[in-house]
Swiss-Prot record:
Organism (species): Lactococcus lactis subsp. lactis (strain IL1403)
Record keywords, A-Z: Cell cycle, Cell division, Chromosome partition, Cytoplasm, DNA integration, DNA recombination, DNA-binding
Gene3D superfamilies on file: 1.10.150.130, Intergrase catalytic core
Stated name of the protein: Tyrosine recombinase XerS
Ranges where the Tyr recombinase domain occurs: 169-354
The family this protein is said to belong to: Belongs to the 'phage' integrase family. XerS subfamily.
Encoding gene, per UniProt annotation: xerS
Amino acid sequence: MKREQLIQNIEKLKHIMPSYVLEYYQSKLTIPYSLNTLYEYLKEYERFFSWLVDSGVADVDKITDVSLSVLENLTKRDLESFILYLRERPRLNTRSTRYGVSQTTINRTLSALSSLYKYLTEEVENEDGEPYFYRNVMKKVQTKKKSETLASRAENIKGKLFLGDETQGFLDYIDNEYEKTLSNRARSSFFKNKERDLAIIALILASGIRLSEAVNVDLRDLNLITMVVEVTRKGGKRDAVPYAPFAKTYFERYLEVRSQRYKTTAKDTAFFVTLYRDVPSRIDPSSVEKLVAKYSQAFKVRVTPHKLRHTLATRLYAQTNSQVLVSNQLGHASTQVTDLYTHIINEEQKNALDNL
């Protein structure tokens, strides 16, 4: 979704929200939460507050009028009814989802509500320096995580990683072979953004940064001499992330054409830009997702930018055998999330031994 459209959608949702949700939104902007995250949270709040009104839990006619006391006095049973509503309503009212929304969707909804409740019961201050209320019913609700072993996750993901020579092979394919699959019209469009697209993909493959971190990189953030890119991690923390040398040439090629092709000036600080009606702007995450999907599907298998991040992490662990180093590279506080990469590498080593 384009940034302009995203902002418009957010404004529409803000218009129907209670005042305390708007306070929450403003507070999270200062951290900062990304606009995409806040948009997803606002959509969850719209669904929740609509249920409060429609079910009669809140004795009001509009979402805007749902008071703080409704949230304060919401019971565990009320929330369980809401969860059942999420599970059952799609089955009753649509043909596309036979068994209701997924557990992942429910967990996302509850996560958004937990964030709002934490703000209202712990973070916000009224005139007396106290939170709006203290009772947090979300602490009584358990979420069910998807049950999957590391072996299963590794098996599902390893076919979508560009390991070994495939990392450079993927970039070479985009650079030299992809155009041969296109019509003359499509080829012209491809050439307009070829250097930029290669630079974006190379950055993620060489550093493992998140999609949101990549699109928010500014010109001043990327150092071609030290081969370090500065990013804003989750929670608003700044981090200096080294990137692999193979990406440098793609950055240089993109910078050679950036100002002329995208008509940028000194005020256009975003590293990755797009041009619409002769006006340059920062590229948005959905555009990157689409271009990664397009190129990867033509090369081998359709993947997401997050799979490119997994690719870097797996390759880095294969070279270092250090979960701490991989965790630092990815911006994780714990090494627990890197267990997956050790399992993938163990499987790759086993397969290599089998072929001896």
